[in-house]
């Protein structure tokens, strides 16, 4: 039997740009079952009516979310299908100086996929098993993914990420607004 397919949106750093959030949701071919929000704009999500649309929200707090009176953690681990995901904004792992510290943490936690924001730079990197990370070889592959910034600005195009999971396989993608 084929495992179910999960379609998710990966969003980060909206910084008040709720119109961009609505535009991203409207553009999706598959209604996402969840939004994975990587911080800096938690307050913005309230205007989307996600519960009424049947879309779950899984979020972490960013460095600019302190004003939001949120109890979301700065990092979390979760499974989608059989894929273990490490979510973080990244400021506590200093990702603006590079993502290797965050990736080493995700690898120690047994993650298959690291999702982070904060830098506003959309990127994806696949690290095969055996790759040296922090002086230690990876025991299994790790994909490192940043969706960029929903808000745009700071010299960056507004962007988002998608994640499709089936069993223990997954595919990440980037989109621009």
What are these regions (language model features)?
Residues 15-19, 42-46, 64-69, 93-98, ...:
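Active-site environment of divalent metal-dependent phosphoester hydrolases
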Residues 10-12, 34-40, 58-63, 86-89, ...:
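Active-site neighborhood of phospho(di)ester-bond hydrolases with catalytic His/Asp-centered motifs
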Residues 54-56, 82-84, 141-142, 169:
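A generic structural signal for alpha->beta connector loops
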Residues 56-97, 101-104, 108:
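Helix-adjacent hinge/juxtasegments
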Residues 2-5, 23, 104-110, 133-177:
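Binuclear metal-dependent phosphoesterase catalytic core
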Residues 1, 74-82, 124-138:
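Short acidic-hydrophobic surface loop/beta-edge motif
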């Amino acid at each position: 039997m084929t495992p179910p397919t999960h379609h998710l949106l990966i969003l980060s750093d909206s910084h008040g740009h709720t119109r961009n959030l609505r535009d991203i949701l409207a553009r999706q071919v598959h209604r996402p079952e969840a939004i994975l929000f990587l911080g800096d704009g938690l307050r913005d999500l309230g205007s989307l009516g996600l519960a009424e649309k049947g879309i779950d929200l899984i979020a972490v707090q960013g460095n600019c979310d302190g004003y939001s009176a949120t109890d979301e953690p700065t990092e979390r681990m979760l499974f989608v299908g059989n894929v273990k995901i490490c979510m973080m904004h990244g400021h506590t792992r200093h990702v603006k100086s590079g993502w290797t510290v965050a990736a080493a943490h995700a690898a120690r936690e047994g993650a298959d996929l690291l999702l982070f924001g904060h830098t506003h730079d959309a990127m994806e990197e696949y690290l095969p098993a055996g790759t040296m990370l922090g002086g230690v070889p990876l025991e299994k592959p790790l994909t490192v993914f940043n969706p960029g910034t929903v808000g745009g600005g700071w010299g960056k195009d507004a962007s988002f990420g998608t994640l499709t999971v089936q069993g223990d396989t997954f595919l990440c993608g980037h989109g621009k607004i």
